[in-house]
Amino acid sequence: IVGLEDLSYNKIIVDAEKVGGKKVFKAKVYSSIVGYRAKLELVLKEDGLVVARIPGSPVDIPVVTLMRALGLESDKEIASAVSMVDDIQNELESSFEKTDVTTSKDAIVYISKRIAPGMLEEFQIKRAETLLDWGLLPHLGKQPENRKEKTQFLGEAVCKLLELKLGWIQPDDKDHYGNKVVKFAG
């Protein structure tokens, strides 16, 4: 019997990659429940904007907008969900500046227009809410009442990503067995 290695599920893995001569910082989570696995990827863009790549969304979604859609209304709530450390909150500044969305409802509408363009607004919003509940971190739950846990987990992932950028932590070793799952038949 041969074991198949895979990255650990439901764990935040941070990494720095060279893309076109530039360093790109990423945080990945393979959220898994029985029979379903969804990859969430957070990317720190060159201009300081943190975006999320979610299955079911053809475009990157600014993480501040995503956290607003999950129920955090104020900038202070979002910054506190990420970290209480001033240096990390300062790194979030450009993410706040580049986001025009100010309410939870506006954030859901923003996401809905990007994932289901050209459809009826009612259908767009339903699709966006389904994405938030089922496509985003399903291991934390698939109901609207699980959105608070999702914002906390997302905040933790953004914090770890910014800590990597600031040089406070090292990139996670993908080859370390602590970051892997070994699957066997049966």
Regions found by a protein language model. Give the residues of each.
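N-terminal non-catalytic structural scaffold regions of very large proteins
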Residues: 1-185
